[in-house]
């Protein structure tokens, strides 16, 4: 018999102390993430985009149920677009280590995480916006809060 997938319940942070603790944990995770190679980041980026796209229908249904706004089918399209477009737009972009070098002038551009990135998620498009922002940040080597 097929095993029913566990539903993940989002953690609600309802205090400044809780937010500070979560951000401290994310900063520690960022230190580990900052050591990853381009290949590791690319693998995570692909897995995240694939997971978001796989969940496009359930996420669309949840968004409409929770907000009372929108049409499920339209949100499915937006979720699919957010997951696939960002992945395809950035999948061949170097985001780790030396990303550009001008040997004539001795200049190197080196990509490195800037830290945590905060983002506002609107009620009107909660899932597609979250997919878009986390994919963008993740592909560029950042963690989104």
Feature annotation, model-predicted:
Residues 1-108:
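N-terminal Rossmann-like NAD(P)+-binding subdomain of aldehyde/semialdehyde dehydrogenases
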